[in-house]
């Protein structure tokens, strides 16, 4: 085991602060409509130009092990906010730096870090309550477009396209982002169904970079029970191979010999196939499998109907234009089922929704209806160069997450003003002990995003903060137009969910760092002096003989049986 270096109290916190500041200073320059770009070197290809906080944070790795610990903890703030809310990563980083930086001064001045933490936790809970109280539900398409525009760095074209997409497929619909071969950014909508089950084996992946499996015009087998014996599946597979088609298998599970054989033959190029677990449980799974069967025109193999898999033919399989599968989700695009049967199924589900008395059943039926009737919208992002394309695609993805968050929990005034105003809710929070110092710390820290937005726009943050303080609740500084106005009326709005997660995650990690008393890291290894002469080169190793191919079992046609 390598020797460790251990640093205590003041030295430990100073090392963390250095790492926090290095990462946060690189990230916070991207905040707001006048935020600057960060250029990131790649080991291959052209550098990445980005204004996305989490992209910058993920690339920062410091040479000093102790400082790097601080940087990685703030990186966790950005990543967690991105995972939970999809946006607000830069705001979260700015808040974490402000809370930790201010808190560290107080700890060094002799305040108890544990009492500070308790005060910070209580203050943040109050701020979140104020943000949620101020949130208003999204009224119309225009507000959704405004949220997307703000998140996409003021790009109105992206805002409008995402608002159109959400209008076409509904709030429950699926919206995906792809690269366009042309220079323009376009919206395509197609009928599709999404459910939360991914591929059963990563060996089914067709795009290793995105870790997705994409099947074009595949045949689709819908089977209720587990498939484990290859002998049951083989007659059908041989028919599929003869037709030269791709295959999607949907069943309770595919395991053992059956899964191993599918993987081997996929890797050998005998058949392009993917297996996915059926969505839902119990009777609900049966219903969803029937939905998928009707959508794709398949005959579902159900146990209670006495159908046997070994008697299946290609005529029993459904089909769709395209199927996209990642580790968690499957999207069936443009199922080729009978339109009249699909409409009949939709009407039957609507009738069940009207008749049911259970809220839980109603919710699940509405989910099924959305999956069957909802579509898939594809935003195709175009740009003049690959570098611009990647940067624009990242902005579209951010904006998409922001619009979903806005629909979920409503909107608040943007430009850092929602948190700035929430500070007023802390006036009534009094403990009459050391915790009050933590509350005052949060009051100052929540102003940091507004000040940083102003600073990035080339304006003095303190002057802007004082002017905003004297205005109405929705009055603030619009950095895009360099003017003071009613930001809500001007369309400068943020999703409440993003603001909530940003302050919550930032305070959580900052408080942890404030209560750190020791750091343990590996000691840097001393460089050994170079040897006098290089040893003679080793003789090349003889190549290993090629392994013979696996013989197919008799009567099994083209299939290798693992």
Curated annotation (Swiss-Prot):
Q: Where's it found, cell-wise?
A: Cytoplasm
Q: Kindly list the positions annotated as binding ATP.
A: 30-33, 51, 87-91, 415, 478-480, 494
Q: Which GO terms describe its cellular component?
A: cytoplasm
A single Gene Ontology biological process assigned to it is: protein refolding
Q: What class of enzyme is it?
A: isomerase
**Catalytic activity reported:** ATP + H2O + a folded polypeptide = ADP + phosphate + an unfolded polypeptide
EC number(s) recorded for this UniProt protein: 5.6.1.7
Detail the disulphide connectivity of this chain as listed in its UniProt entry: none
Which of UniProt's keywords are assigned here?
Answer: ATP-binding, Chaperone, Cytoplasm, Isomerase, Nucleotide-binding
Q: What GO MF terms are annotated?
A: ATP binding; ATP-dependent protein folding chaperone; isomerase activity; unfolded protein binding
Reply yes or no: does the keyword Transferase apply: no
Primary location: cytoplasm
Pfam families membership: Cpn60_TCP1
Q: How does it assemble?
A: Forms a cylinder of 14 subunits composed of two heptameric rings stacked back-to-back. Interacts with the co-chaperonin GroES.
Q: Which NCBIfam families match?
A: GroEL, PRK00013.1, PRK12849.1, PRK12850.1, PRK12851.1
Q: Which family does it belong to?
A: Belongs to the chaperonin (HSP60) family.
Q: Which PANTHER family match?
A: 60 KDA HEAT SHOCK PROTEIN, MITOCHONDRIAL
Relate the protein's function as given in its record. Answer: Together with its co-chaperonin GroES, plays an essential role in assisting protein folding. The GroEL-GroES system forms a nano-cage that allows encapsulation of the non-native substrate proteins and provides a physical environment optimized to promote and accelerate protein folding.
Q: What is this protein called?
A: Chaperonin GroEL 1
């Amino acid at each position: 085991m390598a020797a460790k270096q251990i640093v205590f109290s003041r030295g430990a916190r100073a090392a963390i602060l250095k790492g926090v500041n290095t990462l946060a200073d690189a990230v916070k320059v991207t905040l707001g409509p006048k935020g600057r770009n960060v250029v990131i070197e790649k080991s291959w290809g052209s550098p990445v130009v980005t204004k996305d906080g989490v992209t910058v944070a993920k690339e920062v790795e410091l040479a000093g092990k102790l400082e790097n610990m601080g940087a990685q903890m703030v990186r966790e703030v950005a990543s967690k906010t991105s995972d939970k809310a999809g946006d607000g990563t830069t705001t979260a980083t700015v808040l974490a730096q402000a809370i930790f930086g201010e808190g560290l001064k107080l700890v060094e001045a002799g305040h108890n870090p544990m009492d500070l933490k308790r005060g910070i936790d209580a203050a943040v809970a109050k701020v979140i309550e104020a943000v949620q109280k101020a949130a208003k539900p999204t009224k119309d398409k225009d507000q959704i477009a405004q949220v997307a525009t703000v998140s996409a760095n003021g790009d109105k074209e992206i805002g409008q396209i995402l608002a159109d997409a959400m209008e076409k497929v509904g709030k429950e619909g699926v919206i995906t982002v792809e690269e366009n071969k042309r220079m323009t950014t376009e919206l395509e909508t197609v009928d599709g169904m999404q459910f939360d089950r991914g591929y059963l084996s990563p060996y089914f992946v067709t795009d290793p970079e995105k870790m997705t499996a994409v099947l074009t015009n595949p045949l689709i087998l819908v089977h209720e029970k587990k498939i484990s014996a290859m002998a049951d599946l083989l007659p059908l597979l041989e028919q599929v191979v003869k037709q030269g088609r791709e295959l999607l298998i949907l069943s309770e599970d595919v395991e053992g010999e059956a899964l191993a054989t599918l993987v081997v033959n996929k890797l050998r190029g005998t058949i392009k196939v993917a297996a996915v677990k059926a969505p839902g449980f119990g009777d609900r799974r049966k219903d969803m499998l029937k939905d998928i069967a009707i959508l794709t025109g398949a005959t579902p193999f159900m146990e209670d109907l006495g159908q046997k898999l070994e008697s299946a033919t290609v005529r029993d399989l459904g089909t769709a234009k395209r199927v996209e599968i990642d580790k968690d989700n499957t999207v069936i695009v443009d199922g080729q089922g009978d339109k009249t049967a699909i409409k009949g199924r939709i009407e039957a589900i609507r009738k069940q929704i009207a008749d049911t008395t259970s809220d839980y059943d109603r919710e699940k039926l509405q989910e099924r209806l959305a999956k069957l009737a909802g579509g898939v919208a594809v935003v195709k992002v175009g740009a003049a160069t690959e570098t611009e394309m990647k940067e624009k695609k990242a902005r579209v993805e951010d904006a998409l997450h922001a619009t979903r968050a806005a629909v979920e929990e409503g909107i608040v005034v943007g430009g850092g003003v929602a948190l700035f105003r929430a500070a007023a809710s802390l006036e009534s929070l009094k403990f009459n002990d050391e915790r009050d110092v933590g509350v005052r710390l949060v009051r100052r820290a929540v102003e940091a995003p507004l000040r940083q937005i102003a600073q990035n726009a080339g304006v003095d943050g303190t002057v802007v903060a004082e002017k905003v303080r004297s205005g109405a609740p929705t009055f603030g500084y619009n950095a895009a137009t360099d003017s003071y106005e009613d930001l809500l009326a001007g369309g400068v709005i943020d999703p409440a969910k993003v603001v909530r997660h940003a302050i919550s995650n930032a305070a959580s990690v900052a408080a942890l760092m404030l209560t750190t008393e020791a750091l343990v890291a590996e000691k840097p290894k001393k460089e050994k002096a170079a040897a006098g002469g290089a040893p003679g080169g080793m003789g090349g190793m003889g190549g290993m003989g090629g392994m013979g191919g696996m013989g197919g079992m008799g009567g099994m046609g083209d299939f290798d049986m693992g």
